[in-house]
Amino acid sequence: MEQKLHLIPYQVNEMVEVVEVVPKGIELIAAPKVWENSKGKGITVAILDTGCDVTHPDLSERIIGGRNFTGDDDGQPDVYIDYNGHGTHVAGTIAAINNGTGVVGVAPEASLLIL
């Protein structure tokens, strides 16, 4: 059976990018108040998840290393690319830096070990 596809044209009126530098969840746990005493400097947090986007501008400075324990990328231990996005999100929630390009994490000066 042949079907006809009808496309409705659209026009972009305006483009809006809304980014909260300090996400609501970070505010809700009062992290900005804790930053008066510590932003996580000297602390390493291991992220055991789906990997991490090591080129992400909010994370690349925080990542000190990692290890791939999966069969992804032919099991290469030093390649821990995130093909899912969840591990990158978790890493950002924990330690995204406050660089004005995205959001800030709970401990923006902590180091990340991606597992």
Please describe what each predicted stretch is.
Residues 3-111:
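Active-site core segment of subtilase-fold serine proteases
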